[in-house]
Amino acid sequence: MFVTGESGMAYHNPFIVNGKIRFPANTNLVRHVEKWAKVRGDKLAYRFLDFSTERDGVARDILWSDFSARNRAVGARLQQVTQPGDRVAILCPQNLDYLISFFGALYSGRIAVPLFDPAEPGHVGRLHAVLDDCAPSTILTTTDSAEGVRKFIRARSAKERPRVIAVDAVPTEVAATWQQPEANEETVAYLQYTSGSTRIPSGVQITHLNLPTNVVQVLNALEGQEGDRGVSWLPFFHDMGLITVLLASVLGHSFTFMTPAAFVRRPGRWIRELARKPGETGGTFSAAPNFAFEHAAVRGVPRDDEPPLDLSNVKGILNGSEPVSPASMRKFFEAFAPYGLKQTAVKPSYGLAEATLFVSTTPMDEVPTVIHVDRDELNNQRFVEVAADAPNAVAQVSAGKVGVSEWAVIVDADTASELPDGQIGEIWLHGNNLGTGYWGKEEESAQTFKNILKSRISESRAEGAPDDALWVRTGDYGTYFKDHLYIAGRIKDLVIIDGRNHYPQDLECTAQESTKALRVGYAAAFSVPANQLPQTVFDDSHAGLKFDPEDTSEQLVIVGERAAGTHKLDHQPIVDDIRAAIAVGHGVTVRDVLLVSAGTIPRTSSGKIGRRACRAAYLDGSLRSGVGSPTVFATSD
């Protein structure tokens, strides 16, 4: 049992022995759910708050015994119509049937692929790309969505067209034929598709050992225990949304969820579910990207005519998946402190799909740590703390401490050598939560998942990991400072604004289609922290942004090379057209549009736009002044 002992005894996680995660033989989430069905069969497992018909929502509940029965039924049907190793894609709306679909795939011993209903706007191209990549034999959906799913896959050849099963139509009696799958710790449980910087998604192979390991790492970090309740609105096809909702399967207590749209429309719904319910003695936990905290602070505070809230029970809300803003956390706390929210409740964190999800978070007894470092030193890959009011001060939020039975080291990737604290390098990871590779991509898998750390420092962060351990390259820059992990910047090209992923190629394409004044194929889209934007942006009324030294939220920048014969054109109408097109097409504000002369934007040796090099030149001012060398810039990509 997950317990906190009396007389101030420390929190105890039953799966952690001598500081390391230890599972019984052949453990997996299927066995955990079956255990809860036996010992807590009449207790609530999951509650879906359905706001599609009622403004206050309709609670749709499932008990552990019924959850087990439905999982076994779907698992048995899959065992009847599929073969071991088959991929099973989940194209469900976010409701109880989605969870039954995911667990049904695990129960069958096949490989789950958590995706989304094709009716979800704006993701059709991505969904086709994923289905092309994983080639599922079967799709799980619901009766209501089945027609739309069949229409969606109709364009595929008959040979490539998966079988479609509506999970709510599978009779529970089918469960009688279910057989415990012969899956071991190395068997792939599901593919977590990443939001990579290219149009071709990559599916991270997560095994039946990776999954419970990471769930226990999260529960241990949150000190999850008997009586605690989870709450979420995150999409289940996202790694943070999936792992958060799976915490209940190991903890054995209830979890409440809603759709992302329900939260976005009325963020107070999330806040109200986090609050203490009558008779509850445990705490609540959740997870959300940074933008959600600001959104809730602005639109989620209870009205005077609404019942009072008690948020003193909120143990921890993981804040991750995008850069964490001190300003957003401050607004959230100021908005909800009057309702009992503790200063320790918000937990800046770090994670990625290659690690199943979780890597690090702020310790439970600590408030979020925000320090200020020198911008010039930061650009030179060093962390040097300065006063908050120093001229070159840049706010940095700690991502806390690395989870149990997991290692994160800062590495000079060129030499595969560990770097000392305070120096910025690439974050490399090792542990049983790390996936085994990308589905069908041997070369990429070897480059990312099969790295050897060639040298360690004297007080190594790799202490305890085998000398021949394989390390995962995250593609993220970071450092340790005063025993906390900090994420200095994203190496990846993906642009994340307000919790939403934007493919840079799409943004660049929209910019170029909005005007004939740009050279086709010569535009770069990237994001930078708001407090690192140049003063000219804040002086521009069109940018719509005021300077806040603590605002580290990512803001969109577009750099475009002028087309031949357009240098004498007034730049403002061009900039306005680009801003308007991206606002309409992507729902995001472009804070700066920089028009440069032909040949200015750096390109890689293979001819691709050097976005990271372009970003670096933008930050140091050389791109705007026109003194930088594209050849030099491109080497940093």
Swiss-Prot record:
InterPro entries: AMP-bd_C_sf, AMP-dep_synth/lig_dom, ANL_N_sf, FAAL/FAAC, FAAL_FadD32. CDD domains: FAAL (cd05931). ATP binds at T194, S195, G196, S197, T198, R199, S349, A353, D476, R490. GO terms for biological process: Actinobacterium-type cell wall biogenesis; fatty acid biosynthetic process; lipid biosynthetic process; mycolate cell wall layer assembly. Monomer in solution. Phosphorylated on Thr-552 by PknA, PknB, PknD and PknF. Dephosphorylated by PstP. Phosphorylation regulates activity. Gene3D superfamilies: 3.30.300.30, N-terminal domain of ligase-like (3.40.50.12780). This is Long-chain-fatty-acid--AMP ligase FadD32. The modification Phosphothreonine is found at T552. GO terms for molecular function: adenylyltransferase activity; ATP binding; ligase activity; long-chain fatty acid [acyl-carrier-protein] ligase activity. It comes from Mycobacterium tuberculosis (strain ATCC 25618 / H37Rv).
